[in-house]
Amino acid sequence: ARQRYGSAPKPVVKALEVLSSSIYNPVRSQEGCTESIICARPSWNVRKASTWSSGERYYHLGDIVKAARGYLKAANDQPNLVKKETFRYDLVDVVRQALADAAFYQLQQVRSAFDSGDLAVYRKQVKRFLSLISDMDALLATDSQFLLGTWQKRALDWGDSRQEKALMDKSAKMLITTWIDQVPRSLNDYSNRQWAGL
């Protein structure tokens, strides 16, 4: 923590210990990372966003929630930490992961409510699920590195003419969504991102 943030607040040290023994330390090899269902095409049984990822969750949601709480406590206790780009990035990224994992489990609650036929419970569960997505978008908007607009601007800067800029914009959007614009799309969402505005 000290090397990355210039200080080592206890809540962050504890958060990093939890992450080091959990999400940062998979018990077996897997191809790709565990992906957020928020980035996936809508489905009742979604477990991953891309066509090639395993979609396996090898860590407990409670671990990432503990780590997120540690980062949030440190940010609350020492507001100057949030001014450090490295801390802010990690804070947003860890809380984002906690929200993404919560959404995975919340979708199961939505499905269960749908299957039960109880419309009131279903609406309540859907509202919670959509709230997680809104909360994530608001969180991601707090750091420019998690903004779709930042990605788009960088891509547009590579083009000189209007046509080049249009091509760069299209290519940049394809890279983080469909990957290719042909059928079959065996690499759909290969490089999916959780960014505000996407």
Task: Tell where the protein language model's regions lie, with residue ranges.
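Substrate-binding groove of N-acetylhexosamine-processing glycoside hydrolases
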Residues: A1-L198
